[in-house]
Amino acid sequence: MPDEALCAVLWEYKDRGKKGYDLTERFFEMFASAFPKLSLEGPKRAGSDIQLQTIFPDYPNPNRPVDFVARDASGEPIAVGFVRYDSDRGGAQEDDRTGGYVNCAKEILEYDTLRRRGLKVIYVNDGPGLLLGSMWDDYAKLEAMNPNRLLVITLRMFNERLKEKWLLKK
């Protein structure tokens, strides 16, 4: 392989993950500004995901990671969520992401239904991949599974769709 080709391949990865980290950091900032009585924990940039068993010791799946946990003023968990920057790739990435989200939502809601906490699941997604009509349709179907407990937003939708009343509703 010519040096130029190798350099081009390596250059593509120099900022790998940066857009996702920027998105996560901005979400944390917006959340803190919009909901000063609530708290949000998790890695704002690079860092280990939060395993749900560390929040809920009786959570049945020891390998269920989340990107953040939102807590009310008393410290009780009220929401968990995921932040993803979707590139412009569709295909397998698209199917894996949304299919995994559906399974995850079902698992978390099933667990929480027995405990009656009213836990919400928030999916923060952004990036040009959302322009793929099928990807956005899949996200809309995900939210439609239980709009009282599931929310899919972009940063532009944050102020319009993510409300404290919804977060705190049991």
Predicted regions and their residues:
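Short, well-structured beta-strand/strand-turn elements
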Residues: 34-44
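Interdomain/boundary linker segments immediately adjacent to catalytic/signaling cores
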Residues: 1-36
